[in-house]
């Protein structure tokens, strides 16, 4: 419907806040959610697929990768429910940067941080799919980005 939202960490990263933006996207109109209070989630990335919204987040561990988790909602202002694990215990050594829906195919783009030489940090790309309402991240050594175009 063209409504834009801004998601940020709040209370020293203890919570995630979801704000609805004004029609021109220049101002916050309303705080619509305080998500997972006290859970210390960061790096929120949202994608819509099959009329559902999926948000992937990570735990606040600085440069160290950790278990990514996701939640599902019927709308950005709806109930996000419980966090569920995605990927392996380190989200395949990454942290969500953004999610893409390219021609109906879902793609996770993650930061792969290098704590000792941050300027050598890079990105990874992993296919995502929805199976029976659950978001699944497919590990692969290489992702052919050409098939998404």
What are these regions (language model features)?
Residues 1-149:
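Carbohydrate-active catalytic/glycan-binding domains of CAZyme proteins
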């Amino acid at each position: 419907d063209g409504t834009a939202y801004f998601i940020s960490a709040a209370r020293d990263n203890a919570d995630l806040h979801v704000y609805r933006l004004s029609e021109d996207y220049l101002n916050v109109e309303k705080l619509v959610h305080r998500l997972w209070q006290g859970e210390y989630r960061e790096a929120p990335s949202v994608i819509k697929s099959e009329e559902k919204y999926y948000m992937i987040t990570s735990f606040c561990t600085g440069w160290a990768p950790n278990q990514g988790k996701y939640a599902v909602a019927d709308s950005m202002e709806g109930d996000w429910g419980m966090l569920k694990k995605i990927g392996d215990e380190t989200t395949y050594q990454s942290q969500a940067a953004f999610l893409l829906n390219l021609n109906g195919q879902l793609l996770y783009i993650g930061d792969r941080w290098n704590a000792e030489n941050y300027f050598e940090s890079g990105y990874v790309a992993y296919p995502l799919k929805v199976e029976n309402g659950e978001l699944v991240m497919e590990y692969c050594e290489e992702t052919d980005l050409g098939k998404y175009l």
